[in-house]
């Protein structure tokens, strides 16, 4: 029985991951495919709380990308206005800063990736 649990669990996890990815696609003015990755909230400090909304945007890639930095900037403003602001809770400490980040590939938060194209 245990032999079946691992493959079934993997299939279920992949199915759930696909469903989540499909649900988190966000429309932006440039029309590029943008997927919400996660939200990172810093602890309150002297500057207040910072909330980071991280998105995957493969079309900003240096090699083969089709979205210019100017178009990405407009997309980031739209993501702030239409995605991030509505999701900021009305209770608890309000953020002093909201950061929208786009990356052409998955990058672990806080780690550098010299091959990734990222806009903040």
Regions found by a protein language model. Give the residues of each.
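Positively charged n-region of N-terminal signal peptides that target proteins for export
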Residues: 1-4
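Bacterial N-terminal signal peptides
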Residues: 7-17
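Short linear motifs at secondary-structure transitions and domain/linker junctions
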Residues: 12-13, 23-31, 71-79
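N-terminal secretory-pathway/extracellular module detecting exported/lumenal segments
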Residues: 20-65, 105-106, 111-114
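Mature extracytoplasmic domains of secretory-pathway proteins
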Residues: 54-99
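Polar/charged, Gly/Pro-rich intrinsically disordered segments
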Residues: 93-120
């Amino acid at each position: 029985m245990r032999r079946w649990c691992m493959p079934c669990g993997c299939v279920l996890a992949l199915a759930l991951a696909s469903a989540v990815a499909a649900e988190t696609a966000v429309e932006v003015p440039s029309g590029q495919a943008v997927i919400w990755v996660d939200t990172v909230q810093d602890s309150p400090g002297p500057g207040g709380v910072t909330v980071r909304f991280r998105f995957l945007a493969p079309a900003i890639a240096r090699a083969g990308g089709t979205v210019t930095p100017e178009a990405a900037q407009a997309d980031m403003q739209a993501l702030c206005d239409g995605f991030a602001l509505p999701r900021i809770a009305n209770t608890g400490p309000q953020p002093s800063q909201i950061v929208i980040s786009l990356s052409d590939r998955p990058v672990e938060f806080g780690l550098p990736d010299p091959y990734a194209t990222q806009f903040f």
